[in-house]
Amino acid sequence: MILPDVQATKSEVAINLSRVGVTNVKKLVKVARPDKRPIILISTFNMYVDLPSERRGANLSRNFEVIDEVLEDMVKSPVYEIEDLCGEVARRLLNRHEYATRSEVHMDSELIVKRKTPQTEMQSQKVVKVFAKAIAERGEAIKVRRVIGSEVIGITACPCAQEIMRVSAENELQNLGVPQEKIDAFLNKIPMATHNQRGRGIVSIETAGEYEVPLNTLINIIEQSMSTMSFELLKRGDEYEVVRNAHANPKFVEDCVRDMARRVVTEFKDLPDDAVVKIKQINEESIHQHNAFAELSTTMGKLRTEIGQ
């Protein structure tokens, strides 16, 4: 018995659809590492194709077939970059959906990284978000653009409130008759109080070729661009160091984005000028109900020109 392909029938409203697919697909992904055990990620996938006006629906079961095939093939030919995994899924989606001209794959995961606390040097686990995306387009050949990115939580300290506290402390010490030389020495040694934020830094890089963008490098760039890192486990000595380090390195939300941009240019010298760089910082304020936000969307070429490298 031949079963009907209802999806291939004509729609009553003949218009093209930009994206049709499946979302929130959970899969176990094994990412290979040279000379190390693979990283195991529990990942969420969203997979789409465009749909021409002459079709009523897309054959969505093909999306599941493709992702399972690619994950199975990874056992034989290990994948080292999650954006390459998304790129292969996007390419096969176009091959499987012969009526589509464009496919899109999103992957979101959580990665555990280990960090040593600043004084006791205890190992502490930290959760960071990692994500990848691929867009495949049909032409004379299938062209694929890949995106790799990460979101990391850290700490920022407000420079504005800190300078207000510094001026106030200087005036109080002057009123107490403390010599200016000692006041200056004290203020240069002890960071003044200010309010803090839990910052979320996000960096993504999009390329059209086989360019390597190591996740660990992205994560380090984000961590180093805030006032200091956050830790899940802190003893008293560690807590002192974290608070002191944050207040010794105060940053606005804008400073974080610019620092991330500078580090991206320094770290990724081999990326082409047409690589797309997106950087975002969201700081959850402690003394306000709102969040502070800054964003940059540019290309590596423009970024190199602005920074002068």
UniProtKB/Swiss-Prot annotation:
GO molecular function per UniProt: GTP cyclohydrolase I activity; GTP cyclohydrolase IV activity; iron ion binding
Quaternary organization: Homodimer.
Broad EC category: hydrolase
Biological role stated in the UniProt entry: Converts GTP to 7,8-dihydro-D-neopterin 2',3'-cyclic phosphate, the first intermediate in the biosynthesis of coenzyme methanopterin.
Keyword Phosphoprotein found: no
Assigned keywords, A-Z: Hydrolase, Iron, Metal-binding
The reaction(s) this protein catalyses: GTP + H2O = 7,8-dihydroneopterin 2',3'-cyclic phosphate + formate + diphosphate + H(+)
Superkingdom of origin organism: Archaea
Organism, as annotated: Methanocella arvoryzae (strain DSM 22066 / NBRC 105507 / MRE50)
Cofactor dependence: Fe(2+)
Gene Ontology BP, a term: tetrahydromethanopterin biosynthetic process
Residues marked May be catalytically important (site): 158
Documented EC number(s): 3.5.4.39
Pathway linked to the protein: Cofactor biosynthesis; 5,6,7,8-tetrahydromethanopterin biosynthesis
Segments passing through the bilayer: none
Record text on cofactor binding: Binds 1 Fe(2+) ion per subunit.
Name of the protein this chain belongs to: GTP cyclohydrolase MptA 2
Family under the similarity heading: Belongs to the GTP cyclohydrolase IV family.
